[in-house]
Amino acid sequence: MTLESIMACCLSEEAEEARRINDEIERQLRRDKRDARRELKLLLLGTGESGKSTFIKQMRIIHGSGYSDEDKRGFTKLVYQNIFSAMQAMIRAMETLKIPYKYEHNKGHALLVREVDVEKVASFENPYVDAIKYLWNDPGIQECYDRRREYQLSDSTKYYLNDLDRIATHGYLPTQQDVLRVRVPTTGIIEYPFDLQSVIFRMVDVGGQRSERRKWIHCFENVTSIMFLVALSEYDQVLVESDNENRMEESKALFRTIITYPWFQNSSVILFLNKKDLLEEKIMYSHLVDYFPEYDGPQRDAQAAREFILKMFVDLNPDSDKIIYSHFTCATDTENIRFVFAAVKDTILQLNLKEYNLV
């Protein structure tokens, strides 16, 4: 065999190998494209404390692996910290609102609890357990709790403080409901992918506080659906970042901005009017008309109030061809979210059937 023929043979083998590699790359690109089409990106948006992180936790419970005992144990410290944070917020508000303690000994309990560095809390034992129990039972603190719209207080306060005996027991393991109600402000971006009917739903939760919103921008590509959460109970509350701005007005302004973004022209919009349980409680003593004078419905009527709030948001949509899908939710209620998300999933799949070759 001549040198030329050996070289020609080597070259053709190299060319063959190059073509084989090229074909494999082409095949992989086609697979990637197909797989990307089978992934639906759901962007969870809304102002701070509207319930986005709780919604993601529910997806993990309903469509993922849920929370093992080991996972739940990881929330123990956070539950304790939430309890101290809530009581400290009320102790500070007692001063600001000039509410006296009914029982003199609670001044000492307040001093004790106030001195605690919440971020260092890792256990929950006496004298702190008794101090917090005594404080929570003081009529002054109860009055302060009833006036919580005048300062910042976690929605889970009553839930935890009414259950101190259980939480203070030795070997306490948080329940699923304890985990759902833990409040940890979201900083940065949390993604939760889960598989449903051979489609990957990638849910993206971004921080709702103003300082977090500038990080949203790069999440905006290829968004299938915007899931916007509004806390129905915020109609009489002020912002964490600015105590003279109404939280619901801020939520409306953000919603208006989001639905008019050019990035989202082809994304469906699903509006979750969340915390319906808190609205039902609050509407009995805090009147919607005091904060939204245009409301002309009956007082103490949760149904009328939530329909009015829904209309306020839907009316912000400038595009009459764009449908806004809406659901009233309670993000801490697993069965409610299971039911609502089944409907949402069907809506999203229906809207994307042809594009995703799922028919």
UniProtKB/Swiss-Prot annotation:
Residues 41-54 are annotated as: G1 motif. Keywords: Cell membrane, Golgi apparatus, GTP-binding, Hydrolase, Lipoprotein, Magnesium, Membrane, Metal-binding, Nucleotide-binding, Nucleus, Palmitate, Transducer. Guanine nucleotide-binding proteins (G proteins) function as transducers downstream of G protein-coupled receptors (GPCRs) in numerous signaling cascades. The alpha chain contains the guanine nucleotide binding site and alternates between an active, GTP-bound state and an inactive, GDP-bound state. Signaling by an activated GPCR promotes GDP release and GTP binding. The alpha subunit has a low GTPase activity that converts bound GTP to GDP, thereby terminating the signal. Both GDP release and GTP hydrolysis are modulated by numerous regulatory proteins. Residues 201-210 are annotated as: G3 motif. Palmitoylated. Palmitoylation occurs in the Golgi and participates in the localization of GNAQ to the plasma membrane. Residues 329-334 are annotated as: G5 motif. The keyword Nucleotide-binding applies. SUPFAM superfamilies: P-loop containing nucleoside triphosphate hydrolases, Transducin (alpha subunit), insertion domain. Belongs to the G-alpha family. G(q) subfamily. GO terms for cellular component: cytoplasm; Golgi apparatus; heterotrimeric G-protein complex; membrane; nuclear membrane; photoreceptor outer segment; synapse. GO terms for molecular function: G protein-coupled receptor binding; G-protein beta/gamma-subunit complex binding; GTP binding; GTPase activator activity; GTPase activity; metal ion binding. G proteins are composed of 3 units; alpha, beta and gamma. The alpha chain contains the guanine nucleotide binding site. The keyword Hydrolase applies. Its EC number is 3.6.5.-. It is an enzyme of class 3 (hydrolase). Mg(2+) binds at residues 53, 186. It is found in: Cell membrane; Golgi apparatus; Nucleus; Nucleus membrane. GTP binds at residues 50-54, 156, 180-181, 183, 274-275, 277, 331. A lipid is attached at residues 9-10 (S-palmitoyl cysteine). This is Guanine nucleotide-binding protein G(q) subunit alpha. Residues 270-277 are annotated as: G4 motif. Residues 38-359 form the G-alpha domain. GO terms for biological process: adenylate cyclase-activating G protein-coupled receptor signaling pathway; entrainment of circadian clock; G protein-coupled acetylcholine receptor signaling pathway; glutamate receptor signaling pathway; phototransduction, visible light.
